[in-house]
Amino acid sequence: MFDIGFSELLLIFIVGLVVLGPKRLPVAIRTVMGWVRTIRGLAANVQNELAQELKLQELQESIKKAENLNLKNLSPDLAKTVEELKASAEKMKADLDKAAAETNTTIDEQIQILREENAQTQSNDVATSDTVEKSIADEFSIKNDENPTALSSVVSSVDSIQNGQSDLELDAQAEVDRQLAAMMDKYAPPDDVAENPISTEKTS
């Protein structure tokens, strides 16, 4: 702020030393330095406030410019897309209003009617599937009534197969028993063999 060189400071120091003397010169220097610091602080505050005001003014101008912009300043493609979206939305609203006016109902009532129609359609589909299943079951029972001999033959064949399986199981079990008895006779302990002649002699 104060563009003072070394020579100017030296000149001021000599003048102060001559005028004030060596005793009051240090006090005067401290007082002057305090004033200089205060003045510099005030100047810095003023500069900061001015800078903030300028920034605020620039920001306000930018906001005003942004508010002044409209769809005409946009690109033609974007403006066309926005117009098409608006037109389609208005058309859908007009169709709903027209349908509601023809049936003397509101939009919510129209939605409720559509939901009821969907529920009715689903119930009809369920009833149709039940009818088809019932008709298939009836047809199968009719076929069984018309050809009972075929059904009885199938049942008899199943019974014969089961009986054949049981006979095979019995034969296999008997064969296992015979083999087991043969092995027991073959590997009988010698004591039993020795006792058998003695018993025969006693009997004779």
Curated annotation (Swiss-Prot):
**Quick one: where's region Disordered?**
154-204
Query: Where is the protein localized?
Result: Cell inner membrane
**Top-rank taxon:** Bacteria
Question: Which stretch is the leader sequence?
Answer: none
Q: Where are the transmembrane segments?
A: 1-21
Keyword annotations from UniProtKB, A to Z: Cell inner membrane, Cell membrane, Membrane, Protein transport, Translocation, Transmembrane, Transmembrane helix, Transport
Gene3D superfamilies per UniProt: 1.20.5.3310
Q: Which GO terms describe its molecular function?
A: protein transmembrane transporter activity
Q: How does it sit in the membrane?
A: Single-pass membrane protein
Write out the biased-composition intervals (Polar residues).
154-166
Question: What quaternary structure, including any partners, is listed in this protein's UniProt entry?
Answer: The Tat system comprises two distinct complexes: a TatABC complex, containing multiple copies of TatA, TatB and TatC subunits, and a separate TatA complex, containing only TatA subunits. Substrates initially bind to the TatABC complex, which probably triggers association of the separate TatA complex to form the active translocon.
Protein name per its UniProtKB record? Sec-independent protein translocase protein TatB
Source species, please?
Mannheimia succiniciproducens (strain KCTC 0769BP / MBEL55E)
Taxonomic path: Bacteria, Pseudomonadati, Pseudomonadota, Gammaproteobacteria, Pasteurellales
